Amino acid sequence: MLSPRNRMRRRADFDTALRHGRRAGRNALSVALFVPQDTPDQPGGDAPPRVGFSVSKAVGKAVVRKRVQRRLRHLMRERVGSLPAGSLLVVRAKPQAALLDYSELAAQLDSALRAVTRPRGQSSHRTRASREATSAHTTAVGEQPTQ
């Protein structure tokens, strides 16, 4: 079970994470992570990271939704320590989440968490040089030969 101090309960916290946080989506879930900037009057270093879950009726009936939520909560219990202090994370389940087994759901959650915690400007799988090389190759291949 996720610790009570790590649970997000207030609507304002959900809204903040969803409106101002970094987002990443996978086919079974999406996540939004908001990391507050430390201010002199409100340092976030001692605040624990908090996690909230959103599992809509599109996922399935109540039993299915609750099972998905329990799985996500258990997965986040193991991962909450890797989140920045004072951060707000919202995990939203999509209908595909009900069809995945525990390990597949864990893989998608890990992938989404890596994407939102990665420093800005870093690509997930390709570097800028490889993107430019790919686009140059595509242009060269697609050109018509001159006569």
UniProtKB/Swiss-Prot annotation:
Record GO cellular component, one term: ribonuclease P complex
Keyword line: Endonuclease, Hydrolase, Nuclease, RNA-binding, tRNA processing
Entry-linked NCBIfam families: rnpA (TIGR00188)
Listed EC numbers: 3.1.26.5
Tagged with keyword RNA-binding: yes
Cited function: RNaseP catalyzes the removal of the 5'-leader sequence from pre-tRNA to produce the mature 5'-terminus. It can also cleave other RNA substrates such as 4.5S RNA. The protein component plays an auxiliary but essential role in vivo by binding to the 5'-leader sequence and broadening the substrate specificity of the ribozyme.
InterPro entries referenced in this protein's UniProt entry, alphabetically: Ribosomal_Su5_D2-typ_SF, Ribsml_uS5_D2-typ_fold_subgr, RNase_P
Protein name, per record: Ribonuclease P protein component
Region Disordered, annotated ranges: 117-147
Molecular function in Gene Ontology: 3'-tRNA processing endoribonuclease activity; ribonuclease P activity; tRNA binding
